[in-house]
């Protein structure tokens, strides 16, 4: 998190943050409503994992306006300074929370298909809860090292000299941070990527031998969305860890690839959507209710289409 983070076009940062906020927030709020409803009716392990992923995305999105204000002010931090390390900590923690939870989902999906009898005999919900706690701990513990280094090593926030939010590390502090970043890239990105790739490749192979076309399409959509997050959103950022370790300094393009990592909050809902046909049905139902509430004329159009197609109109009262 050196000064290279904020070099470049400030309005590019603002535009990307704003786009992610406007697209990601409503989608993740809707996903939260759907998952809470599903867990109340019939708790399933994969839904608990995806609920945690949704909460992680919402934490990032709720603190994203702080970054938007910062970018709009030319990367000057004019807000209470306590929000600087807090927003930064959540910003980086959610990156690795996503990779860990996506990996947990891939394992859950693979086990349910490859070993269905064994899978049904296991207390999956309790295990999913334990896995969720471990994921939160691993991501938080790794990302907290940056801030421990800051206070322990008397690093100075650059706010003290130029009003920005980013840390300026000395050479001895970089000697600690750069290996930690490399370890994060290996343990929290590369290993999860390998596990996820293995699970989904085996899953696709198993389903190709007898599953319905609809189920295969859903799994392929889930695979595509997951790999898009790993390779496009998180791959370049974690590559900067490797480059930084080799060159002994943060690369100048690190700030731009970090922007890509925020896009996962918009792509994660695709993972939710392809996670199950039940989620798709609940999502469509919730979206229909919102449209009827916000745009009343859509209900009349729906009734007219049903009458035109010879269908029986619903007897429900307008919501």
UniProtKB/Swiss-Prot annotation:
Molecular-function GO terms, alphabetical: G protein-coupled receptor activity; lipid binding
Gene ablation phenotype (knockout): Knockout mice display a retarded growth of sympathetic innervation and the superior cervical ganglion is significantly smaller. A heart rate decrease is also observed together with altered secretion of cardiac noradrenaline that might be due to reduced sympathetic nerve activity. Contrary to wild-type mice, oxygen consumption is not modified by feeding or starvation. They also display impaired SCFA-triggered glucagon-like peptide 1/GLP-1 secretion and impaired glucose tolerance. Finally, knockout mice display altered protective intestinal inflammatory and immune responses.
Q: Which residues lie on this side of the membrane: Cytoplasmic?
A: 37-43, 120-127, 207-218, 276-319
Cystine pairings recorded for this chain: 84-165
In the bilayer, the protein is annotated as: Multi-pass membrane protein
Where's it found, cell-wise?
A: Cell membrane
- Kindly report every residue range on the membrane side named Extracellular: 1-15, 65-98, 149-183, 240-254
**Which keywords has UniProt assigned to this entry?**
Cell membrane, Disulfide bond, G-protein coupled receptor, Glycoprotein, Immunity, Inflammatory response, Lipid-binding, Membrane, Receptor, Transducer, Transmembrane, Transmembrane helix
Please give the residues the UniProt entry marks as glycosylated. 154, 162
**A single Gene Ontology CC term:** membrane
**In which domain of life is the source organism classified?**
Eukaryota
What does the record say about tissue specificity?
Expressed in white adipose tissue and skeletal muscle (at protein level). Abundantly expressed in sympathetic ganglia such as the superior cervical ganglion. Also expressed by intestinal endocrine cells.
Predominant place of localization:
membrane
- Which regions span the lipid bilayer? 16-36, 44-64, 99-119, 128-148, 184-206, 219-239, 255-275
The UniProt entry, under Gene3D superfamilies, shows: Rhodopsin 7-helix transmembrane proteins
Q: What does this protein do?
A: G protein-coupled receptor that is activated by a major product of dietary fiber digestion, the short chain fatty acids (SCFAs), and that plays a role in the regulation of whole-body energy homeostasis and in intestinal immunity. In omnivorous mammals, the short chain fatty acids acetate, propionate and butyrate are produced primarily by the gut microbiome that metabolizes dietary fibers. SCFAs serve as a source of energy but also act as signaling molecules. That G protein-coupled receptor is probably coupled to the pertussis toxin-sensitive, G(i/o)-alpha family of G proteins.
| Record family assignment | Belongs to the G-protein coupled receptor 1 family.
> What name goes with this protein?
Free fatty acid receptor 3
The gene for this chain is Ffar3
